[in-house]
Design a protein with these regions (language model features):
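Surface-exposed interaction/ligand-binding surfaces
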Residues: 8-9, 13-317
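Positively charged, low-complexity/disordered segments
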Residues: 1-7
Length: 317
């Protein structure tokens, strides 16, 4: 490895001469030659492109990749933190010093099985990178929300100008703190125009289903009705509408069930309430459709959907 200084001058501070040395071995005298030494001013190490601190400042960067900077309330966004480093240095250890608290967001850390080195291009330069953290966020406040910087302590090996006995490059280990930039999210409120009174904050794309485990039974029996919402959106952040039944049917508090997967793109799956219902008298009883309202951010509008109407036949009383 070689480096040159362009436009630099060496100023001679002094000149020294090392005189002859002699030694007598078995009657023979051996003499060394004189050596002239020029002492110059020290060249600042910061000018050297192989100085570890110079390499770190130029070739190490922590970036935060944000999927969307202007979402609606309760619309999912992702933030992925990547450590970029030059191919000429080796990262040997990483630790998180400071992390954002993601205030005013519902947040979920998306697990990374293991750190893997990949290649990318950033600002016209080639880098290695590791993905350090993935976060799924749902903004809970309209307006500007700041995501504070993340800071990592990075231990790296950088090449020096020195080589070992076998000609291999000698590396120098250094530790450096690197931070991402602050991220500003501008959250849009829900539109007030045509906003239904029944809207309770559900955002995404959903369907609603109602299903009874019995359509005909005796008055001394019970049956169950499951009211289920499926789709993609903020499934963990809203309530299922209540099931309305005729007054002659005794309805008990529902059992809630959640089957939701959380990934970098958001939540998807289903949530449901299962009601146990006991009839009091003989007859046919309609269980009316249940209305559910959600906001679709892609279509930028509110959508009303209905579950099926159910009819239960009580054959004796």
């Amino acid at each position: 490895i070689s480096a040159s200084l362009v436009g630099s001058e060496m100023c001679i501070r002094d000149r020294f001469t090392i005189g002859q040395a002699s030694i007598e071995i078995e009657g023979d005298i051996y003499k060394t030659s004189t050596v002239d030494i020029l002492v110059t001013e020290a060249v600042s190490s910061s000018l050297s492109p192989n100085n570890p601190d110079t390499i770190v400042s130029d070739d190490l960067e922590l970036i935060a990749e944000v999927s969307k900077r202007s979402p609606y309330l309760n619309e999912p966004i992702s933030v992925v933190y990547k450590l970029l480093f030059s191919p000429k240095i080796n990262v040997t250890n990483l630790s998180e010093i400071d992390a954002p608290d993601f205030k005013n967001f519902w947040s979920q850390n998306i697990k990374i099985p293991r750190l893997e080195i990949n290649r990318t291009s950033h600002n016209g330069k080639s880098y290695n990178y590791v993905t350090w953290k993935k976060m799924l966020l749902y903004p809970q406040k309209a307006g500007d929300i700041d995501i504070d910087p993340m800071t990592l302590d990075v231990t790296i090996d950088v090449p020096t100008n020195r080589r070992d006995f076998f000609g291999n490059v000698i590396y120098s280990q250094t530790s450096n703190k690197v931070s991402s930039e602050k991220v500003k999210i501008i959250t849009k409120p829900f539109p007030e125009e045509n906003k239904p009174e029944e809207f309770n904050g559900a955002v995404g794309d959903f369907k609603i289903f109602a299903e009874s485990n019995k359509s005909e039974l005796s008055s001394n029996e019970s049956f169950q009705v499951e009211l289920k919402i499926t789709g993609s959106g903020n499934l963990k952040l809203f309530s299922i509408p209540d099931l309305v039944v005729p007054s002659s049917l005794e309805k008990y508090d529902p059992e809630f069930n959640e089957n939701v997967k959380v990934g970098l793109s958001g939540m998807n799956g289903s949530i449901s309430n299962t009601y146990t219902i006991v009839p009091q008298f003989q007859g046919k009883y309609p269980i009316p459709s249940t209305e559910f309202v959600y906001f679709n951010p892609r279509e930028k509008k509110y959508i009303k959907i209905l579950s099926e109407e159910l009819v239960v036949n009580i054959i004796d009383g």
